[in-house]
UniProtKB/Swiss-Prot annotation:
<dbReference type="GO" id="GO:0003899">
    <property type="term" value="F:DNA-directed RNA polymerase activity"/>
</dbReference>
<keyword id="KW-0862">Zinc</keyword>
<keyword id="KW-0934">Plastid</keyword>
<keyword id="KW-0808">Transferase</keyword>
<keyword id="KW-0479">Metal-binding</keyword>
<dbReference type="GO" id="GO:0006351">
    <property type="term" value="P:DNA-templated transcription"/>
</dbReference>
<keyword id="KW-0804">Transcription</keyword>
<feature type="binding site">
    <location>
        <position position="305"/>
    </location>
    <ligand>
        <name>Zn(2+)</name>
    </ligand>
</feature>
<keyword id="KW-0548">Nucleotidyltransferase</keyword>
<comment type="similarity">
    <text>Belongs to the RNA polymerase beta' chain family. RpoC2 subfamily.</text>
</comment>
<dbReference type="GO" id="GO:0009507">
    <property type="term" value="C:chloroplast"/>
</dbReference>
<comment type="subunit">
    <text>In plastids the minimal PEP RNA polymerase catalytic core is composed of four subunits: alpha, beta, beta', and beta''. When a (nuclear-encoded) sigma factor is associated with the core the holoenzyme is formed, which can initiate transcription.</text>
</comment>
<dbReference type="GO" id="GO:0003677">
    <property type="term" value="F:DNA binding"/>
</dbReference>
<dbReference type="InterPro" id="IPR007081">
    <property type="entry name" value="RNA_pol_Rpb1_5"/>
</dbReference>
<dbReference type="GO" id="GO:0005739">
    <property type="term" value="C:mitochondrion"/>
</dbReference>
<dbReference type="Pfam" id="PF05000">
    <property type="entry name" value="RNA_pol_Rpb1_4"/>
</dbReference>
<keyword id="KW-0240">DNA-directed RNA polymerase</keyword>
Amino acid sequence: MEVLMAERADLVFHNKVIDGTAMKRLISRLIDHFGMAYTSHILDQVKTLGFQQATATSISLGIDDLLTTPSKRWLVQDAEQQSFILEKHHHYGNVHAVEKLRQSIEIWYATSEYLRQEMNTNFRMTDPSNPVHIMSFSGARGNPSQVHQLVGMRGLMSDPQGQMIDLPIQSNLREGLSLTEYIISCYGARKGVVDTAVRTSDAGYLTRRLVEVVQHIVVRRTDCGTIRGIYVTSRNGMMTERIFIQTLIGRVLADDIYMGPRCIATRNQDVGIELVNRFITFRAQPISIRTPFTCRSTSWICRLCYGRSPTHGDLVELGEAVGIIAGQSIGEPGTQLTLRTFHTGGVFTGGTAEHVRAPFNGKIKFNEDLVHPTRTRHGHPAFLCYIDLYVTIESQDIIHNVNIPQKSFLLVQNNQYVESEQVIAEIRAETSTFNFKERVRKHIYSDSEGEMHWSTDVYHAPEYTYGNVHLLPKTSHLWVLSGGPCRSRIVPFSLHKDQDQMNVHSLSAERRYISNLSATNDQVRHKLFSSDPSGKRGGSILDYSGPNRIICNGHLNFIYPTILHENSDLLAKRRRNRFILPLQSNQEREKELMPCSGISIEIPINGIFRRNSILAYFDDPLYRRKSSGITKYGTIEVHSIVKKEDLIEYRGAKEFRSKYQMKVDRFFFIPEEVHILPGSSYIMVRNNSIIGVDTRITLNIRSRVGGLVRVERKKKNIELKIFSGDIHFPGETDKISRHSGILIPPGTEKKKSKESKKKLKNWIYVQRITPTKKKYFVLVRPVVTYEIADGINLVTLFPQDLLQERDDVQLRVVNYILYENGKPIRGISDTSIQLVRTCLVLNCDQYKNGSSMEEIHASFVEVRTNGLIRYFLRMDLVKSPISYIVKRNDPSSSGLIPDNGSDRNNINPFYSIYYKARIQQSLSQHQGTIRTLLNRNKECQSLIILSSSNCSRMHPFNGLKYHNVTKESSKGDPLIPIKNWLGPLGTVPKIANFYSFYHLITHNQILVNKYLILNNLKQIFQVLKYYLMDENGRIYNPDRCRNIIFNPFNFNWYFLHHDYCEETSTIISPGQFICENVCISKNGPHLKSGQVLIVHIDSLVIRSAKPYLATPGATVHGHYGEILYEGDTLVTFIYEKSRSGDITQGLPKVEQVLEVRSIDSISMNLEKRVEGWNERIPRILGIPWGFLIGAELTIAQSRISLVNKIQKVYRSQGVQIHNRHIEIIVRQITSKVLVSEEGMSNVFSPGELIGLLRAERTGRALEEAICYRAVLLGITRASLNTQSFISEASFQETARVLAKAALRGRIDWLKGLKENVVLGGLIPVGTGFKVLVHRSRQHNNIPLETKKKNIFEGEMRDILFHHRKFKLLNYCIPKNFHDTPEQSFTGFNDS
């Protein structure tokens, strides 16, 4: 102690905070100066001091100490903004799903990391003595990333498969998580629980296998005499300085190291910290060191090849069991690390990139010939540098040069103005050979059904020559042109050939062709052709002879349109399968009649009305109620107006309410208050009790009325009703009490008491209530009475001329009650209930006879007068050749849909099979091109029918005073502007005919507020000129005289009006694809993506389509023009993803490497390097030597690569394992070779595993070439292929190993530790090693005899004894003679 005190006086006094790293350094220097005993004494004092201080400080942790970083809010906002922009780009087709995922993850990872860095500075500035800060940054408990989760943001998490979830947890644990965030973070928590349970056992098993492989490796010699070594250098950037120092310290040099002429270190010198610092200072050449790889032995190792012992810092002692130390050093951290489950966000990054920023504002210049355009990993456009590129940034008085290395991305253009701190280039981080990546497949699925088109050429993948898998050679879009396939089951034989033009009736409300399964083909044919085939019914033939004339079939009916005021617009609400167009009538009348509701016209999607269809309705506000209640019709019966067979269009709609037609002039509404409560609610009132207004029913609900409470418990909830009214306890003489559930009219006497009698003023409802069996009382409830008028006069609603019943179409007004008799009505809070609806019903039941049924087709006509545009609803009466085939109660049948199309010039072969005469029917429904498809299921023929029922159009008309403004609805219903449903191709929900878009030109001057009477018009229709394009790019001019008909598609056209005369900036040709938000006219960006089909002088027709971006190398599934269904796979991207550094994925990876399991994909860069290597080496060294040296170097390189892979996983978790431990393991698993078929069958059998050095030696001794292949044995296989069968049998497969050993007559020489432990012998390590040393010294003196009588004996001696100098890898053959007693050796020598 005196010596220590004396020395202490001379020591330097340091006053600074010591963290964990500084503590490690201090301890190592103390050991160097004072040795182990003194150091432990000093450290005891440090420990005591620490405990004293901690007790005195008494740091506690309160919730207020968790302070969120103030900059978090704007950082998260910024990241969200970036994500939003990214989402937009993905929607427009600028980036594909993989790029979006990558970028999204990097945005959030960067935000999270930045927040973590901010956290430390924030604590340091605001609260340096914060306990959380002190603990986490002292290294005592917790680390910054854990504290970051408490006060920063939790960030990105992995799912159970280890894939990153791209939805980050933005909250921290202090603020609390939302429900979604909680569920995502539960993944991590569950992972942690599973890891501790499962992975701990995995780690233990890993340790056991590792020790099994190397338990016999003991230090038995000082020097094996090898001259080989491994070169280490820190120059090429593959190794950081820290790793370089760790690799060198404790090693032994394999060669002298010179600095110029001067030798600064000699061979076999062990490397300490001073020597390493000298190497770094002098920037010495690559340094050759000895490693276990270069040792000439297999079953032991020499001191110099192992180096310093990690425990006491000197060269390792003889007899040290370094194998077991190595096995435990690798296995043990795994056991510790399973307790950590942290998720690093850099999963998708292939090495982070450095950014070069502009130092000041200025113009950038570079040589454009040295770069070529490309895409970055995030889908941004950039330039890739071929070679190092000099970039000049010029400001007014400064010129700045930047050198950008090759393979970097330049993110700006030549001569572009850049701002200060703008990122101008991204330097790729040098990815090392061993940065193993995996190839991941990402499938992109179609969002909608439609037809697939490519905007570039594609290649067939060679393995799928006859399949439908294609490879993309360059970046391009895949377009899914929207539309739906239709299948016909009734006509399984195909009458239409591919590319035939035909007329097809529109789809049903469901947009599916599902026919009645019960109808056979014969029935269909009979139905189709039993009606008059010549089609000569009165006025129903369309004449197409005139070039510019359409003669209509006489049945024209108009409904009064809206007057479009300035800034007003027609609005359509999409409801189920119909369109509702609210119609405004004259404003003065509107105020009188309908204070707050308008008339709505309801048109089916296919535009066809049947008999008794409702054309328009309006909801009278007089018949609205806010409260719940019961409707009663009194005693008069009613009948439902909507019969079962008329419900086809409503089938499948849950919200359908049948309407009841009234024959009565009044009905009654009995109000009641209803609350539907969850089953677990605590109800604060009793059943049958009487409460007042505003009584508390549950904790947060109060009653709105007073009265009797009835509670009814259902399966899942509780229904609580409150009946208002008087309670009446009946006397014996009371008449009312005998009745229950009846309405009593006013005027009836009500006996209140014996004395007075009173007459009722209003209707009342009497309800008898029996709380117990004997008692009962009567509740008298008030009733609201509604009178219904006989029908509103149509004149008040519509102008006079509508009411003239023209041409078979009649309109009548009907009032419907929307609720049936006695049905309780439940009012949802704040919405009113409409009790009565007034409807306008179409009547057309003149023709009762059989096969033909009347239909009314609705279409819109646009009329322009004096610059004002009006839309008229036009009704056409059409006779349908087929009535609906409907089987009652058959849910699958939605009826056969007739084709009432005119067969122009025999376009439709369906008719021509049966009749040579051409059938010309009125008003064809949907024209389309038919394309036969690859059938998905062979039983039904698939047809694709393009129909233009989804037309929309933009109207930039010049000189008009109306604007396309969508009014907001008060309830916020989604409103569809009706403009978008009108267009050159058709009518609102369907095409009545290809030319049903008319400009009605009139020669009479018409005033705005007057209605256009049809008789004033001369029926001259201007037909627009179009260009049509089919899939093959042929362009047609659809004259009436020719057969070409447009192929429209379901729901997917819209129209864009554009004045080409004024602005010819963009030339648009048919077939061109247009992305969303691209400006094609000066009126602003175009709002939908699609393909241009028709170019007109002032408009375009665009078929809507969705683009999907695909980059080169992506695989496209499906054929050009194939019909895709929603959810089909469109593209498969293959991208590289760095393996996760998470230990829970890390441990299996370590195990995967050590067990040498085949990984799904070899690292791309390693594959390329091996190919290049095989080409170059033989070229340099000539054929035989090149291949031999190449094979040797490949084995060496693969060993180093394995070591680096294992180190990488541990280093990512901050665990330091010395390379030499891993090298000992790797040496064992790479030291075997497999004898090939052509091998020496007289010595080794083919397929036998032998040691590499032993194979080489045997070949030299017998002067014959042995063919063998280097193999990597997994640690389990290596454990079962050792020299000792006892060791193998005690590991696994005991019976098999022992049986095999017995059959082969194997001898176990008990060299390892395990065999001796099993049999209770002395372990040949440590003190038990001295016997071995003594023996080996004697054997070293045996002379080598070359010439002997028996040559074979000499050769065998070569094989078996030369291993003293060149130790062979001799596992499988029992060649362990050097452990036998000495007499046997003498005998062998004398023979």
